[in-house]
Design a protein with these regions (language model features):
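N-terminal edge beta-strand
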Residues: 23-46, 144
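Beta-strand signatures of extracellular beta-sandwich domains
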Residues: 63-65
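Mature extracytoplasmic or organellar-lumen-exposed domains after removal of signal/transit peptides
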Residues: 117-364
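C-terminal motif of bacterial Sec signal peptides marking the signal peptidase cleavage site
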Residues: 12-15
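Bacterial N-terminal signal peptides that target proteins for export
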Residues: 1-5
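Extracellular/periplasmic metallocenter environments
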Residues: 29, 79-120
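Bacterial signal peptide processing site
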Residues: 17-20
C-alpha cells in the first residue's frame, strides 16, 4: 500500500532540497524528469520522512514509488507536468528502490542508522489494528463475491454474471491501494485493456466485463474466471501476512481519491458496464474508513484539519447523492460533462486537506 520514504544524506541535501521540518521529520525534494527520478541515488537516516515530488516537464515520469523487493511501500501517482505531491513514512534501515514510471530507470535509496521506534501512540495503534481488520474483512468478502461472479461466468449465465459483477468490484475498490502494493497483482486483477503491454495477456475483471457487456457472451472466459479466482486467493494470502504503518492508512486514502480522479470521473474504469459511480463510491468508502480510524489521533494533533476533511467527505457524499438509485447508481454514460465536473470538484476539494494527514500523523 502507499507509504513514504526518505531524505538525502548530508552530501545530497543541498542538491535535492532535503531538510528537517519543524517537528523533527525529514523532507526530501524529488524532481520527475524524462530521465527518471532526480536524484537517482539517495541516502538518509532512518525515521519519519516526507517526499515532496514535482514534475519538471516530464511526460514519461509521472509517479514516484518506494519499493522494498516486490512490494510498493509508498507511491504518488498522476503527477503530470507542473504538478506536485507528497507522501510520508517512518523509514527503517535498509536498501530500497525508487521508481518514477514506465521507461525510466530505477534509483536507489539507502536508509542508514538505527531503527526508529515510533513513539507510543495508543490511538494510532488502534487505527492500524482497525484497518488491518477492515482489509481482512473486505478481502474475504471479495473472495466470496468473486467466486459467485466467476461461477456464473463459467456456467455461461450472462445476466446473472452482470448482476453479480458490481458486488465483487466494490470489495476490491475499497482496498485497491493494498492490492497495488503487491506488485503484479493489481494489473492481473484490475487492468484495463489500454494498461496491457504488447505481448502480455489481458486478465481480470475488465476482460470479463468487456465480454459480458459488449459481446453478451461468456465464450472463452472460463480460463479468465479461473485465473481471477486464483489471483484473488493470492491477494488474500498476502493480506493475511501484511502489516501497516499509520502513514500508509493516510496515503492509501489519498491514492483512492487519485483513483477516482484518474479513472472513475473520466469513465475509463468501467467503460463497458458504465458502473463507474459504484467504483467511485467504493473508493470513497475505503478512504473514509482510513480517515475515521485515524481521526482520534488527528484530532489531538490538528483538530481543524480533522474537521475540514470530515466536512469535505460530506461534500463528496452530497455530490454523489443525485445519482443514487437504491443501493446502486445511474449508468455513468448518462452523466453529462458539467455534472462530471461537479463531481471532480468535490473530490479535489477533499483531496487537498486529506493529503496533509499523512505528514501530520507521521510525526505524532
Amino acid at each position: 500500500m502507499l507509504v513514504t520514504a526518505a531524505v538525502a544524506a548530508a552530501l545530497l541535501l543541498a542538491s535535492c532540497g532535503g531538510s528537517d521540518d519543524a517537528k523533527g521529520g525529514k523532507k526530501v525534494s524529488i524532481a520527475l524528469t524524462n530521465n527518471g527520478c532526480a536524484p537517482a541515488k539517495l541516502s538518509t537516516p532512518a525515521g519519519p520522512t516526507t517526499f515532496e515530488i514535482t514534475n519538471k516537464g516530464s511526460d514519461k515520469a509521472t509517479e514516484f514509488e518506494v519499493q522494498k523487493g516486490s512490494e510498493i511501500l509508498g507511491e504518488k501517482e498522476n503527477i503530470t507536468d507542473g504538478l506536485s505531491g507528497s507522501f510520508s513514512l517512518n523509514l527503517q534501515p535498509g536498501r530500497y528502490t525508487t521508481f518514477c514510471g514506465q521507461g525510466t530507470p530505477k534509483g536507489v535509496l539507502v536508509v542508514t542508522g538505527k531503527a526508529q521506534k515510533a513513539q507510543a501512540n495508543p490511538q494510532l495503534d488502534a487505527a492500524v489494528r482497525g484497518y488491518d481488520r477492515y482489509v481482512r474483512d473486505q478481502v474475504v468478502a471479495l473472495r466470496t463475491a468473486t467466486k459467485a461472479f466467476t461461477d456464473a461466468v463459467r456456467a455461461g449465465d450472462v445476466e446473472k454474471a452482470k448482476q453479480l459483477y458490481a458486488a465483487a468490484r466494490v470489495r476490491y475498490e475499497r482496498i485497491e491501494p493494498v492490492a497495488e502494493s503487491f506488485g503484479g497483482l493489481d494489473p492481473a486483477i484490475d487492468a484495463r485493456i489500454n494498461d496491457v503491454a504488447k505481448g502480455q495477456e489481458w486478465t481480470g475483471f475488465h476482460r470479463i466485463e468487456q465480454a459480458l457487456w459488449t459481446k453478451g457472451s461468456t465464450n472463452g472466459m472460463a480460463p479468465i474466471a479461473d485465473k481471477l479466482d486464483e489471483d484473488v486467493g493470492l491477494l488474500e494470502t498476502k493480506v493475511d501476512a501484511a502489516s501497516y504503518q499509520p502513514a500508509q492508512l493516510a496515503n492509501g486514502a489519498v491514492e483512492l481519491l487519485n483513483e477516482v480522479s484518474k479513472s472513475k470521473i473520466t469513465g475509463e474504469e468501467e467503460r463497458y458496464s458504465h458502473l463507474d459511480l459504484v467504483d467511485f463510491q467504493a473508493n470513497v468508502d475505503g478512504a473514509k474508513q482510513a480517515f475515521v480510524l485515524l481521526r482520534p489521533a488527528l484530532n489531538r494533533r490538528n483538530p481543524t484539519l480533522a474537521r475540514t476533511v470530515a466536512s469535505r467527505f460530506d461534500g463528496v457524499d452530497a455530490a454523489l447523492a443525485p445519482y443514487r438509485r437504491g443501493v446502486t447508481f445511474v449508468d455513468y454514460s448518462t452523466v453529462d460533462p458539467a455534472q462530471r465536473r461537479k463531481l471532480s470538484q468535490a473530490v479535489d476539494a477533499l483531496g487537498e486537506p486529506l493529503s496533509q494527514v499523512g505528514g501530520t500523523i507521521v510525526a505524532s
